[in-house]
Amino acid sequence: MVKHSDPNSKLIAENRRARFDYFIEEEIEAGIILMGSEVKSLRQGGSNIGESYASVENGELWLINGYIAPYLQAKTWGHEERRKRKLLVSRRELARLWNATAREGMTIVPIRMYFNDRGIVKLKIGIAKGKKLSDKRATEAKRDWGREKQRLLKQHS
């Protein structure tokens, strides 16, 4: 059995809107192929995965539109901020992702990017289905009610 690392070990970036905009059906941990300057930039905290998504192309999984800030000390041999980056998953997981995206309305969204306990960059991706406006309103109402409940409990204790 594969030991999955703790995703809270060193959080780099989190897509906070993913759970608001999508129903996340399943989460998968993926490795990511990076250049040295990208890893150094991530250690400084320069990343954004809010507008990115993943797709299966030619039997490979790619992260598209993920932003990693330029590393200032690597001016000559730096990296492109929004280039396609290859994600590493097992063949079985890749087949599951491909089958999921073949269904209508399903997509692959990045949820969080972090360093695992060995210092390797990992990306938690989710198989997701987009929410309609009414679903988003229900989620927001549920969240507001939870906050109101906590406020009332805090006042009475």
From Swiss-Prot:
Cellular compartments annotated: Cytoplasm
Chain positions covered by the region annotation Disordered: 138-157
Main location: cytoplasm
GO cellular component assignments: cytosol
Classification via InterPro entries: SmpB (IPR023620), SsrA-bd_prot (IPR000037), SsrA-bd_prot_CS (IPR020081)
Listed GO MF terms: RNA binding
Biased composition, class Basic and acidic residues, residue ranges: 138-151
Superkingdom per UniProt: Bacteria
GO BP terms in the entry: trans-translation
Keyword entries, A-Z: Cytoplasm, RNA-binding
Record-linked HAMAP family: SmpB
Function: Required for rescue of stalled ribosomes mediated by trans-translation. Binds to transfer-messenger RNA (tmRNA), required for stable association of tmRNA with ribosomes. tmRNA and SmpB together mimic tRNA shape, replacing the anticodon stem-loop with SmpB. tmRNA is encoded by the ssrA gene; the 2 termini fold to resemble tRNA(Ala) and it encodes a 'tag peptide', a short internal open reading frame. During trans-translation Ala-aminoacylated tmRNA acts like a tRNA, entering the A-site of stalled ribosomes, displacing the stalled mRNA.
Record family assignment: Belongs to the SmpB family.
NCBIfam families: PRK05422.1 (NF003843), smpB (TIGR00086)
Protein name per its UniProtKB record: SsrA-binding protein
